Amino acid sequence: MIRAGGPSPSPRGRRAGPIRLPRRAPSSTPTRAKTEEKASADASSRTGADAEVQFEAVIGIETHVQLNCRTKAFCRCAAVYGDEPNTHCCPTCMGYPGTYPVLSEAVVRKAVQLGLGLNARVRRRSKFDRKQYFYPDLPKGYQISQFDEPIAEGGYIDVVIPVEDGGGVRRIGITRAHVEEDAGKLTHYPAKGDTPGYALADYNRAGVALVEIVSEPDMRTGREVAAYGAELRRLVRYLDVGDGNLSEGSMRCDVNVSVRPVGREAFGTKVEVKNMNSFNAMSRAIDFEIDRQTALIRAGKGDEIVQETRTWDEGRQCTVSMRKKEGLADYRYFPEPDLPPLVFDEAFVEKCASAMPELPGAIRARYADLGLPPADVQVLVEDKELVEYFDAALAAGAPAKQCANWLTGDVMAWLKNAKDVAVSSMPLSATQLAEFCTLIEDGVISGKIGKDILPDLLEGKEGNKSVGDIVEERGLKQISDPKEIEAIVDRVLEANPGQLEQYRGGKDKLKGFFVGAVLRESGGRANPALSNEILMRKLNEGR
């Protein structure tokens, strides 16, 4: 059981339509940007001992995961994306006097599952706090969050590291995961002529449940951080606690970057980078920020690196200063007086754990035991539906390596080009794919024939018909009789006496010509290994 509550809020006071606010002027200036660009240019031309010092980045990431609950965290307003502004608001999420928050059990359940998925210690008792700051997207003037007693702490994620950064699997530590409510969304409009700039506030998102996941500063490059973010999104999607959509803001990553000389234990000045709506953009933003800080240090301007929040400007491909970064004291945390401590028993945690699916790390290990190449494993694990489809094909008797090869290659290429076709709705059933791969594995049909008939299977032209029946009807069985293949080779050699004479005279490049000719003569049905063996024996008889 869980305990957390307060009186039910009133649904009255709802008001639709955008709220217009004066636009906050940005703190960055073109002059400052030019100074930073000049520092980078100056650093590239410096020589001497300072220029030879090697620097490394120290990177941690705070990830806000929006939970896919039907209602907000502390009221009954719908938690939906893209509806008309300010149509899912109530006195509770707008902070009206006399209203009290009531914690959703679904939020707790999903937060516990996410904590378990992060290999973290789920606390049986946690509490909520008020994080206070004043900004137009925060209607209450404070955010309900968790400060010193989060719902989960400690933990790790095993991340597949890009080859450029050494490859392999690296364990990234998780400091904590805590529940909080989201803020509203501001849309900024620039000044036009005599019309000043302004912002519109949409509070539909205010109060939507989040879990903030704070990593240890264990990462060193933009690619590593992007790999960590992608793995965290996989976990979120496998657990079905959120959709992890960066472009819609349901997963947002704030990256803390500092630079220090290699070998030094003390951290440099931490800079927060925000507003990256893809993992590719995240990698580029971090690498730019590392270069910016390194350039300033090398130019003797390290004191210009200040603790601040910077935004990634996709158009200019650079980070731009937004505001001074607040410290913990600035938020004036204190216990949320309207919510009791969150307490649940072991039975509740076990119930949450029992509903969890197999997670990406365990699937990778299982597929590695099947002997699948790491590249194929990564492609398969990327999509939960693809894993389910592949497992169904294995259960139907598909040879693992053959099936993974076709699924991650030709089938995925077809899906990429097809419009509005998901793995689950693909005409090619897992049973058909299993039979298809078995026929190739057993040598009944060749890979060439497989490529010829696969498009028809993917497009559903043969319905649910057995692949074996299709092969029989079309006469596509592979020719593996040595005498039959020898007759095909003889016909090819007899039809091309000039090329045969040139080959036997030393023009070895003509081998490919004869291989192709045999393939065409057999209609693509000749056993490749056997036909190559017989062809080479026949070609070399007169040399």
Curated annotation (Swiss-Prot):
Q: Which family does it belong to?
A: Belongs to the GatB/GatE family. GatB subfamily.
Which cellular component appears as one GO term in the record? Answer: chloroplast
Q: Which GO terms describe its molecular function?
A: ATP binding; glutaminyl-tRNA synthase (glutamine-hydrolyzing) activity
Q: Which GO terms describe its biological process?
A: glutaminyl-tRNAGln biosynthesis via transamidation; mitochondrial translation
Enzyme class, spelled out: ligase
Question: Subunit composition?
Answer: Subunit of the heterotrimeric GatCAB amidotransferase (AdT) complex, composed of A, B and C subunits.
Q: Give any extra note attached to this record.
A: This protein may be expected to contain an N-terminal transit peptide but none has been predicted.
Q: Where is the composition biased (Basic residues)?
A: 12-23
Catalytic reactions on record: L-glutamyl-tRNA(Gln) + L-glutamine + ATP + H2O = L-glutaminyl-tRNA(Gln) + L-glutamate + ADP + phosphate + H(+)
> EC number(s)?
6.3.5.-
InterPro entries given in the database record: Asn/Gln-tRNA_amidoTrfase_suB/E, Asn/Gln-tRNA_Trfase_suB/E_cat, Asn/Gln_amidotransferase, Asn/Gln_tRNA_amidoTrase-B-like, GatB, GatB_Yqey_C_2, Gln-tRNA_amidoTrfase_suB_CS, Gln_synth/guanido_kin_cat_dom
Q: What is this protein called?
A: Glutamyl-tRNA(Gln) amidotransferase subunit B-1, chloroplastic/mitochondrial
Segment Disordered: which positions?
A: 1-47
Question: Which species expresses this protein natively?
Answer: Micromonas commoda (strain RCC299 / NOUM17 / CCMP2709)
Source species, domain of life: Eukaryota
Q: Which gene encodes it?
A: GATB-1
Q: What is the lineage of its organism?
A: Eukaryota, Viridiplantae, Chlorophyta, Mamiellophyceae, Mamiellales
Question: What this chain does, per the record?
Answer: Allows the formation of correctly charged Gln-tRNA(Gln) through the transamidation of misacylated Glu-tRNA(Gln) in chloroplasts and mitochondria. The reaction takes place in the presence of glutamine and ATP through an activated gamma-phospho-Glu-tRNA(Gln).
Please tell me whether the keyword Zinc-finger is annotated for this protein.
no
Write out the annotated subcellular location.
Answer: Mitochondrion; Plastid, Chloroplast
Which keywords are on file for this protein?
A: ATP-binding, Chloroplast, Ligase, Mitochondrion, Nucleotide-binding, Plastid, Protein biosynthesis
